[in-house]
Amino acid sequence: MIKFLSALILLLVITAAQAERIRDLTSVQGVRQNSLIGYGLVVGLDGTGDQTTQTPFTTQTLNNMLSQLGITVPTGTNMQLKNVAAVMVTASLPPFGRQGQTIDVVVSSMGNAKSLRGGTLLMTPLKGVDSQVYALAQGNILVGGAGASAGGSSVQVNQLNGGRITNGAVIERELPSQFGVGNTLNLQLNDEDFSMAQQIADTINRVRGYGSATALDARTIQVRVPSGNSSQVRFLADIQNMQVNVTPQDAKVVINSRTGSVVMNREVTLDSCAVAQGNLSVTVNRQANVSQPDTPFGGGQTVVTPQTQIDLRQSGGSLQSVRSSASLNNVVRALNALGATPMDLMSILQSMQSAGCLRAKLEII
């Protein structure tokens, strides 16, 4: 009976633990994307391009491009173009990208163009931080937004000054890679955690032998690998598919001060406390009054005098009791019972943490 209970308890503990693959928790150091950027022109717009009188760089770029094609524009020519726009083009060079491989690009207007819908990006070199050209971009732009205007009225859905070209750039230069050089590789945790780093190292050592992996710090695990690209690929494939029991995360509440959004994980708990939140509202009313002379022939003139009225109201918040909560559902239910807006909730959570009632780290972004 005792053995059965022990086995049952062990089974419950193992079931409660959440297992994840090492590939979902880590990344290989040095295997990363690299940002590319370029400046180009979009043509073929339906009268929604840059106003060239206000964006002289668009005209200058067009003149330079035409001169490279053997077309000379007379000096002093004032070109009134509406179907051309100057844009910035960005892309990410993937790890192990090879010549001839295509990547997606994002096109964004940098002038006063109204829309890039229906436009075509002309050949644009994409450079890295070393000013070397790694890809060439060109193609038709796909804009996700929509808009129309007529008679002084307009309507717009989403953004029209940016778009995307799927497979719009071709890689022309490869980045040198250090993969396969040396007998060690570093795995980097997505989030720093000493216990998780040690647990991953222990899992690799159990399967590959003691000394195969060492946790260097809270984010880095050094792994001994065989030499050669093909051997390291097979070795990493086996390691990344190993299962690791994920320990509970640190309780954390993230507050976005710009949008007022509040996000918390399931480890957040509350202690018993009492909360009172008062609302302060300020109302400003401004009205223009017309003052005229009493008699039409008595002199004077008609003037407009503004009248401003400011009202200040503060509604007293009642003291609300918040019970101790051990689960995320209970925490959400307790906070909703306060009836506070997201902006009020930010102040309440900060005060709760200062009072020691919020058992979590508070991060404001």
Swiss-Prot record:
The keyword Transmembrane does not apply. GO terms for biological process: bacterial-type flagellum-dependent cell motility. The keyword Manganese does not apply. It is found in: Periplasm; Bacterial flagellum basal body. It comes from the Bacteria. One of its GO terms (cellular component) is bacterial-type flagellum basal body, distal rod, P ring. PANTHER family: FLAGELLAR P-RING PERIPLASMIC PROTEIN FLGI (PTHR30381), FLAGELLAR P-RING PROTEIN (PTHR30381:SF0). Assembles around the rod to form the L-ring and probably protects the motor/basal body from shearing forces during rotation. Belongs to the FlgI family. This is Flagellar P-ring protein.
